[in-house]
Amino acid sequence: MPEYRSRTTTAGRNMAGARALWRATGMKDDDFQKPIIAVVNSFTQFVPGHVHLKDLGQLVAREIEKAGAVAKEFNTIAVDDGIAMGHDGMLYSLPSRDIIADSVEYMVNAHCADAMVCISNCDKITPGMLMAAMRLNIPCIFVSGGPMEAGKTKLAEHNLDLVDAMVIAADDTASDETVAEYERSACPTCGSCSGMFTANSMNCLTEVLGLSLPGNGTVLATHADRRKLFEQAGQQIVAITRDYYEQDNVNVLPRSIGSKAAFENAITLDIAMGGSTNTILHLLAIAQEAEVDFDLKDIDRLSRKVPQLCKVAPNTQKYHIEDVHRAGGIYGILGELERGKLLDSSVPTVHSTTLSAAIAKWDIQQTSDDQVAHFYRAGPAGIPTQVAFSQDTRWPSLDGDRAQGCIRNVANAYSQEGGLAVLYGNIAADGCVVKTAGVDDSILVFEGPAHITESQDEAVANILAGKVQAGEVVIVRYEGPKGGPGMQEMLYPTSYLKSKGLGKNCALLTDGRFSGGTSGLSIGHVSPEAAAGGAIGLVRNGDIIRIDIPNRSIDVKLSDDELTARREAQNELGWKPAELRPRKVSAALKAYAKLATSADKGAVRDLSQLDD
């Protein structure tokens, strides 16, 4: 039977000093016999997805205490990718993921916590905490802050999100008044941005990974039903903590739940729902922490057989996350995948012995539980607010239409190939990633001359100045994990291509990455990156690039001899931008760049370099 980790600081005469300090935090005599559970919060007033989390850690803590354990809360950092977008602030976003993972490890191990509840929400916070959960391998449950409601305005027939505001702002034909109305309407409530962007994609994936409760990815931040998720997380973490330490049930540990099958289920869901390409980057990093052999080739294999069953903004203007919830949420999609024999539902979760049993209860197509139907009718109130759990609106009915609704069955899939694809070729020997869910059918095969830029700033300037022509492949290089450093998101370049009418007439190729809000022929994560000697650094203006998504290939039309000659010349010059960029790179970012791997490895730090 494993011993409670916390006994290191709470048991024995020699720990009198530690107990004295624990007492100063409010612990009493009988508390020293209880499990100590860390409540890992990420409240900040900088981020709309986290602005409402301040009191929610204590909500969870009170439930933990009612269930007979001790709760101790701490906070991590949280970067808002949308606010950090389009300037040097974005250099810090991806590195913050590893800082978050480290900070959770530091706090939990330093204080010998027995288990943890992770309260996350936005882009790098959920994956950072997932990395920590797999690294620590102690009982853990995730509960997110929830998605914001979609925006509404009389100026548009469809609901709005952040990307709509960005696109309209770059549209020269839009008046200042129209831009201001979109800006005021796009993000009406607290919560993670309302489309299937990175934050919501990752929170949905925690459900299929088995580390969160049903509805974690789709119940609105403003809805009263989400309060129940926080309360249940506090209760359930105590149950599984006792199950591990007192019954020796290792099946409740993150690495037991996060098996190879669970990671394959996660990417299967991601492909089926057309999630953000960032999820690939994060799943690869999380799998490494879990010591699971899961790589781009697994993702490539699954992308060829999993259909797209759900289409949500930014891939369509018709649906947002609130509509996915009305259609049965993530368990609605999982039910269709299970019926299509595309899921390994034998894996365990933190709330059910198997995923199959959970699907049987939570899939609206097969359950007879009226409470489940009531749960998935939770909808938006349309009232701007930063207050969690402030409304209890219900949709009048569920969206159970699997032929033409938000979630489709396999027979009526949006497409028989899923929403993500991995491409290989002489420009990306180790692969690159495209969100096919956002690519128009007319440009699934695309060939055009390269338009070289060596920073996101240069790409934006060229697009806005009208220098980018229809038919070109805009290359943004030296923006990878090392080269940026920090692997910036390219939401502004792709949004501006749209606003200039080039969304279906140009491609964008980068060793950087894309926001979950990106759509169009946007190919990122090119590996190896330019700064690591990748062939993307050898391409010149006018070189012809051929992209063939159906055949999963991407190549620059140059001979091997020409590429070899260019490589030899580049080796002499060094793998860096041709001209010095006006970019301030701090010591902290330089440290990240020194250890960072390319995107095909999840852009994690290669700590083996420290062994030399």
Curated annotation (Swiss-Prot):
Pfam families attached to this UniProt entry: ILV_EDD_C, ILVD_EDD_N
Coiled-coil regions listed in the entry: none
Record's function text: Functions in the biosynthesis of branched-chain amino acids. Catalyzes the dehydration of (2R,3R)-2,3-dihydroxy-3-methylpentanoate (2,3-dihydroxy-3-methylvalerate) into 2-oxo-3-methylpentanoate (2-oxo-3-methylvalerate) and of (2R)-2,3-dihydroxy-3-methylbutanoate (2,3-dihydroxyisovalerate) into 2-oxo-3-methylbutanoate (2-oxoisovalerate), the penultimate precursor to L-isoleucine and L-valine, respectively.
Gene Ontology biological-process entries: isoleucine biosynthetic process; L-valine biosynthetic process
Family in the record: Belongs to the IlvD/Edd family.
Catalysis: reaction(s): (2R)-2,3-dihydroxy-3-methylbutanoate = 3-methyl-2-oxobutanoate + H2O; (2R,3R)-2,3-dihydroxy-3-methylpentanoate = (S)-3-methyl-2-oxopentanoate + H2O
Protein name: Dihydroxy-acid dehydratase
Modification N6-carboxylysine occurs at: K124
Pathway: Amino-acid biosynthesis; L-isoleucine biosynthesis; L-isoleucine from 2-oxobutanoate: step 3/4; Amino-acid biosynthesis; L-valine biosynthesis; L-valine from pyruvate: step 3/4
Catalytic residues (UniProt): S515 (proton acceptor)
Gene name of the encoded protein: ilvD
InterPro entries: Dihydro-acid_dehy_C, DihydroxyA_deHydtase, DiOHA_6PGluconate_deHydtase_CS, ILV_EDD_C, ILV_EDD_N, IlvD/EDD_N
Residues engaged in binding Mg(2+): D81, D123, K124, E489
Annotated keywords: 2Fe-2S, Amino-acid biosynthesis, Branched-chain amino acid biosynthesis, Iron, Iron-sulfur, Lyase, Magnesium, Metal-binding
EC nos: 4.2.1.9
Domain of life: Bacteria
SS bond partners: none
Cofactor requirements of the protein: [2Fe-2S] cluster; Mg(2+)
Quaternary context: Homodimer.
Cofactor binding: number and manner: Binds 1 [2Fe-2S] cluster per subunit. This cluster acts as a Lewis acid cofactor.
Gene Ontology MF, one: dihydroxy-acid dehydratase activity
Binding site residues for [2Fe-2S] cluster: C122, C193
Top-level EC class: lyase
